[in-house]
Amino acid sequence: MEPVASNIQVLLQAAEFLERREREAEHGYASLCPHHSPGTVCRRRKPPLQAPGALNSGRSVHNELEKRRRAQLKRCLEQLRQQMPLGVDCTRYTTLSLLRRARVHIQKLEEQEQQARRLKEKLRSKQQSLQQQLEQLQGLPGARERERLRADSLDSSGLSSERSDSDQEDLEVDVESLVFGTETELLQSFSAGREHSYSHSTCAWL
């Protein structure tokens, strides 16, 4: 923004100089030298005598340079007019008013840029602080220990559930074997009792 502001300042000075020259040409008087102290009168120096051809040549060169400078200044002002947020009556603006509005607009843009930079730095510091807090929380031994205990508890609960299922299956197998074994023993004892009674009855008949 600084080079643009310096260019605007140069354009302001050039516009003021041109307007002053135009007013002087209209009224037909010359202005005082601006750099002398008050009370001193600017004295005109007599130009040295030159040949008429050289005088005309120098004047034509000066006019050509002045024409180029005015054309360049006009192009710059037109580009500035296109970039400025002007209103509806932008055609009424003079060169000086346009340059003043451009300077005010540049100052506003610089203020907005500074505010954006401050906000960016604030957000960056906040992000760094949150990142540090996250790293501290991840690096705490208590957090790691809690995570390890949680994993161990999940593993132990899985093993206990598997053991309970296997114990239940063993218990069912034992109960079935006990039931089947009892029935077999009862059948064997019953058949043995019947054979014993048959033997006693046979002996009695004999």
UniProtKB/Swiss-Prot annotation:
UniProt subcellular location: Nucleus
Tissue expression from the record: Expressed only in the proliferating areas of the testis and thymus.
Region of interest called Disordered, as start-end residue ranges on this chain: 29-66, 122-171
UniProt xrefs under SMART domains: HLH
Gene Ontology biological-process entries: negative regulation of DNA-templated transcription; negative regulation of transcription by RNA polymerase II
Compositionally biased region (Low complexity): 126-138
Gene3D superfamilies reported in the protein's UniProt record: Helix-loop-helix DNA-binding domain
Ranges of residues in domain bHLH: 57-109
Keywords: DNA-binding, Nucleus, Repressor, Transcription, Transcription regulation
A single GO molecular function term of this UniProt record: DNA binding
InterPro entries found in the cross-reference section: bHLH_dom, HLH_DNA-bd_sf
Ranges of biased composition (kind: Basic and acidic residues): 143-153
Principal cellular location given in the protein's record: nucleus
Residue ranges of the region described as Interaction with SIN3A and SIN3B: 8-25
Oligomeric and partner information: Efficient DNA binding requires dimerization with another bHLH protein. Binds DNA as a heterodimer with MAX. Interacts with SIN3A AND SIN3B. Interacts with RNF17.
Note: Mice deficient for Mxd3 show increased sensitivity of neuronal and lymphoid cells to gamma-radiation induced apoptosis.
Protein name per its UniProtKB record: Max dimerization protein 3
Species for this entry: Mus musculus (Mouse)
Gene name linked to the record: Mxd3
